[in-house]
Each structure stands twice: as structure tokens, then as C-alpha cells.
Amino acid sequence: MPLVELLTSAALGLSLQLLHDAIIRAKERSLITRCILDRLDATLHKITPFVIKIDTLTEEVDEPFRKVIEELKRLLEKAIRLVDAYAELKLRNLLRKYRYKRRIKELDSSLRWMIDVDVQVNQWLDIKKLMGKMSEMNTKLDDITRQPMDIIEATGRSSEEDGCTKPTIDIHFRWKNQTKEHEIRFIFK
């Protein structure tokens, strides 16, 4: 596994844990806006299986998927900063609290959107499995077509015996699959 991908997956897990800790600290300080932080925490619990899948898939990710991982990492870091700054605000600074609350809601909705719509990890896994099966089937097909075949070309009865003026060509293909023998015979008159 390349070092960059290892650091990215480790950074995602670490960012997730740091954000969860920041939410717990913010909940302890601010009882009034606990519902917003609970919603963000629920989103984190929804993201956790996704991050675990990313950790297992980082060995062979494509460029678009790597961009999605970087975007998720950036969103998690932004969420950590927002939640920490929100927890530090005093109760009497209502305008700033409102702004931070609105930004946290937007961040939560973008995280949910990223997981629900933009990133389809299960579909990506299914496509990856199908591509593997297709590759395996192509390999088997190549093995079948590359097997040596017995080709027999023979001229049938002579035209004098038949009373015909056209010669007969007999082409016979034989090949053996794992347990079966196959033959195809073509006769041209």
C-alpha cells in the first residue's frame, strides 16, 4: 500500500475520532444547541462504516475516488474547526453562535449528501467484483480458444465415383475442454 494512501486512510480515521471528541466537548459546554450536535454525531456514526470501507479499499483506488477521499478529509477537518470554535463561543454572542450553527448544519447536510449520493461505495465494490469476474471469464475464454485443435481437411469421394463435377471438402475441428470433448464438422460440396 503506498504511503500516501495509508496516510489518507489513517487521517480519515483520526479526523473522524477528533471530530467525535470535539462534539462531546461541545455538548458539555452548550446545552442549548445539543440537538444540532446530536445530529452531526449521528451523521458521524453513519459515516463510520463508510470510512472503514475506505480503509479496506485504499490499496487500489482510482483517481476520482481518491478525490472523493480528499474531499471527505477536508470536510471532516472543517467540521472539527467549526465545532471547536462553536464550543468556545460565549452564550451572549448570539449572532456568531447563529452563524456557526448555520455552518454546522450546512456541513452536516454536505456530509450526508456525500455519503448518500456522491459516493456509492457499494456500487463501486459491485462493479469491481463484476470486472474481476469478467476478467476471469475472458481468461477462460482465451484458454479455450488457444487450445490446440486437430484440424483435418480431407477431400471426400472423387468426382468420378459420384458422377459430380464438384469436389467435396470435409473440415473437422476437435478440441478437449476439461472434461468434455467437442467436435465440429463442415462439409463443403
Swiss-Prot record:
**Membrane topology per the record?**
Single-pass membrane protein
Q: Which InterPro entries match?
A: Powdery_mildew-R_dom
Q: Which residues form the RPW8 domain?
A: 1-153
Where is it mostly found? Answer: membrane
Residue ranges annotated as transmembrane are: 7-24
Q: Name one GO cellular component term.
A: membrane
Gene Ontology biological process terms in this record: plant-type hypersensitive response; response to fungus
Triggers of expression: Expressed in leaves after powdery mildew infection (e.g. Erysiphe cichoracearum UCSC1).
This protein's source sits in the domain of life called Eukaryota
Instruction: Give the signal peptide, or none.
Output: none
Residues annotated as glycosylated are: 177
Q: What does this protein do?
A: Probable disease resistance (R) protein.
Tell me which family the UniProt entry assigns to this protein.
Answer: Belongs to the plant RPW8 protein family.
Write the protein's name: RPW8-like protein 1
The species this protein was found in: Arabidopsis thaliana
